[in-house]
């Protein structure tokens, strides 16, 4: 009975995922670039078009700088330097 319920795996060839190089944190690579909530031009790079914060696996930031970016984006939203919703959400 338990054999009937378990899904069988296909014995076909497995798809290989192309290897992508790990992105380097731009703030660790260049120490002169700083994270500042008063600089919306830099922070917009880390916000999707829907207004969501881009995760670190996509942006390539380290955990420390991703936390700082998240905090800076939230501060900038709070004082209306960045929109809370995306740029085309009001349409």
From Swiss-Prot:
Region (Disordered): 1-21
GO cellular component: cytosolic small ribosomal subunit
Compositional bias ranges of the Basic residues kind: 12-21
A Pfam family: Ribosomal_S18
GO BP annotation list: translation
Swiss-Prot/TrEMBL keywords: Ribonucleoprotein, Ribosomal protein, RNA-binding, rRNA-binding
Gene3D superfamilies per record: Ribosomal protein S18
InterPro entries: Ribosomal_bS18, Ribosomal_bS18_CS, Ribosomal_bS18_sf
Source domain of life: Bacteria
Keyword Ribonucleoprotein: yes
One MF term in the entry's GO annotations: small ribosomal subunit rRNA binding
Assembly description: Part of the 30S ribosomal subunit. Forms a tight heterodimer with protein bS6.
Family membership noted in the UniProt record: Belongs to the bacterial ribosomal protein bS18 family.
HAMAP family: Ribosomal_bS18
Main function: Binds as a heterodimer with protein bS6 to the central domain of the 16S rRNA, where it helps stabilize the platform of the 30S subunit.
Official protein name in the record: Small ribosomal subunit protein bS18
Gene name linked to the record: rpsR
């Amino acid at each position: 009975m338990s054999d009937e319920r378990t899904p069988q795996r296909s014995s076909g060839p497995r798809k290989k995922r192309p290897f992508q190089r790990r992105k380097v944190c731009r703030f660790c690579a260049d120490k002169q670039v700083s994270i500042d909530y008063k600089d919306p031009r830099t922070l917009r790079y880390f916000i999707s078009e829907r207004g969501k914060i881009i995760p670190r696996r996509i942006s390539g930031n380290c955990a420390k700088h991703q936390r700082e970016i998240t905090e800076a984006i939230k501060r900038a939203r709070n004082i209306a330097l960045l929109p809370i919703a995306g740029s085309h959400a009001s349409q």
